[in-house]
Amino acid sequence: MPDNVDFIQEQQAELLERQINAARVKHCGASALVCEECDAPIPAARRAAYPSATRCVSCQSVFEAKNKHYRRTA
């Protein structure tokens, strides 16, 4: 006979599964059509090569150059 703890554990497992599935859907979205930085169109070739692209090549290069100093190495 299930008790309250079993019921709550089942609810938590279902909630976790829904959250994981929602996160997977967010990361598998289509590429943006325009760059989030400069609003220039993102070429179809870039969107095909990098499906989750949100920046044009130029803006992505600048973004990576700025952020490479903040990466931590293990």
From Swiss-Prot:
Coiled coil, from the record: none
Protein's UniProt keywords contain Oxidoreductase: no
Keyword Zinc-finger in record: yes
InterPro entries in alphabetical order: Znf_C4-type_bac, Znf_C4_TraR, Znf_DskA_TraR, Znf_DskA_TraR_CS
Source domain of life: Viruses
Keywords: Metal-binding, Zinc, Zinc-finger
Gene expressing this chain: ORF82
Protein name in the entry: Uncharacterized 8.2 kDa protein in gpA 5'region
